[in-house]
Amino acid sequence: MYQRFFINLMNVTIVDYKSGNISSVINSFKEVAKDKVKIEVTSDINKIKSSDKVVLPGQGSFKSCVDGLNNINGLVDTLNEFAITNKKPLLGICVGLQMFADIGYEDTETKGLGWISGKVSKINNQNGKYKLPHIGWNQINIVNESKIFKDIENNSHMYFVHSYEFIPNDKNVISATTDYSSNIVCAVEKDNIFGTQFHPEKSDKIGLKIIDNFISL
């Protein structure tokens, strides 16, 4: 009965590739989904392929997260097929967003997924004026309309934990920035690909609304 109940529900997969503690991501998506959407947590490539939407979380360094993806046979190819070939909705969170880049410079020079051309570099702390990692609540400035920002007020506060920033080559993909040392990119949208540098799962009711907007696409 339980399996049959889910048979016609939308399926959202959170990719678990051992990138750190993703329990808050899982709990937030399940809270928003309730019994309307099936939330799956897996690295199984066949389950990812059959999903309606995918969430790519990321905690730790750029290199460790990329290595985590590469260590699971076929996972990167499956994500490329899902997001680039089939153009299904995908949301990257924190380092999950950063891995959209061509290259990252944390720990060592590491090739990213290359979905959105650009690089990931360390935030300029202006000779120690700004503490790194950047931890805590910060206002976001919505600079372009984004489907995941539906009914989100500009200058809302979101929760951040990061020392590196994504710098895309095409500024048109930027949907929001935050002021910390400089205007740091904190959200992007390119076709079916969405990303947040902040943690919506840790950003109270507004963050849950962003998750709901993604699920509702």
Q: What do these predicted ranges mean?
A:
Residues 98-100:
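Glycine-rich nucleophile elbow surrounding the catalytic serine of serine-hydrolase chemistry
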Residues 92, 96:
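Gly/Ala-rich beta-loop-alpha elbow adjacent to hydrolase catalytic centers
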Residues 165-217:
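C-terminal and late-domain segments of enzyme folds
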